[in-house]
Amino acid sequence: MDDYVIRREGKAVFYAPNPKKYDIYSAPVFYNPAMEKNRTLSVLLLKVAGAQMGGGLTVCEPLSGTGIRGIRYVIESGVVGKLILNDLSKEAVHVIQKNLSINGVEADVYNEDANVLLHKLRGQCDVVDVDPFGSPAPFLSAAFRALKNEGIVCATATDTAVLVGRYPRKCLRRYGSVIRKSPFYLEMGLRNLVGYVARIAASEDFAIRPLLSYWEGHYFRTCVYAVKSAKDADDMLQRDVGYVEYRRYRKVTRRQSEYTSGPVWIGELGDPSIAFFMAREGQYSDFLKLLEEEYSVSLPWFYKLPEFAVDGKSPTLEEAMAALRRAGVYAARTHMASDGFKAEATYGEVERVLRRVT
């Protein structure tokens, strides 16, 4: 297998395409080493949330590639009772079986179209992790159908330019939304993804509650806890899906206009307590502590320091945060911009505070 090399990730060893022969696009089996953080955070999430669910979970990864994500779930989370791996590529299935063997992990392995498999698994899974190259949109309806009456659905989206509205027609066509230009466009892109997941969930009579959502360089990622209830789905759509208006100031609205982005998720992007317990595991703890603080701000946008510049000068992030807190405003840094912060205050309220320190 000179086309493959042995790699290590987390507590697993596995065969992956030889990077000296292939890039990630030409490799016979898909594996992206740049997604290690994604996989590690997913393991931590399943370890924390899966324990709360009682363990012994049936976990399905319908787009498995080398199988490393699912294998790490079993080895490192301690909550997987049954693992289901799948890939449309026969070569990938062969590699998955070898990787299961060298790690001593058992799994049901399929060579199916992802949607076909998920439909066959209707109502059987506690966790479905959709991690495609590109958009998760084609797989989400089937993912929720494969779920039991409650469980977790995770989705990765690498089509970030579409989600942030850089390609308006494709955004509308693929996600049914319009995203306007704004200083906080990355948060709108993330909320666009979560909002789409929520609307698809509702179409299958599920209500969702985000556990972990974030942006990382070239992708957005969200993991949501879903409960089957038509009434709760109706309530969720009414409460947590809407529009964000931007005309320097920001506001949440239920009406679409030339100034609004949406429909997007306007509720919490994640559970602060989940991020807290994940951080205690020690891996990516600084990032997770940042998310914990960020999730505690309810307003669905962030501010950037240059918005409050006077004569071309703006306060440092530390000065701005300290001033807001002295004024009794809860504020937190955002992981989506080095000069950005979230605050439980309107643009005008933030402006009045920061003008005193510029």
From Swiss-Prot:
Highest taxon, organism lineage: Archaea
GO molecular function, one term: tRNA (guanine(26)-N2)-dimethyltransferase activity
Record's keyword terms, sorted: Methyltransferase, RNA-binding, S-adenosyl-L-methionine, Transferase, tRNA processing, tRNA-binding
Pfam family, one: TRM
UniProt binding sites for S-adenosyl-L-methionine: 39, 69, 87, 113-114
Reactions catalysed according to its record: guanosine(26) in tRNA + 2 S-adenosyl-L-methionine = N(2)-dimethylguanosine(26) in tRNA + 2 S-adenosyl-L-homocysteine + 2 H(+)
GO biological process terms, semicolon-separated: tRNA N2-guanine methylation
Domain Trm1 methyltransferase stretches: 5-354
Record flagged with keyword Zinc: no
Enzyme class: transferase
Entry's EC annotation: 2.1.1.216
Keyword Chloroplast: no
Similarity comment: Belongs to the class I-like SAM-binding methyltransferase superfamily. Trm1 family.
Function: Dimethylates a single guanine residue at position 26 of a number of tRNAs using S-adenosyl-L-methionine as donor of the methyl groups.
UniProt xrefs under PANTHER family: N 2 ,N 2 -DIMETHYLGUANOSINE TRNA METHYLTRANSFERASE (PTHR10631), TRNA (GUANINE(26)-N(2))-DIMETHYLTRANSFERASE (PTHR10631:SF3)
Name of the protein described by the UniProt record: tRNA (guanine(26)-N(2))-dimethyltransferase
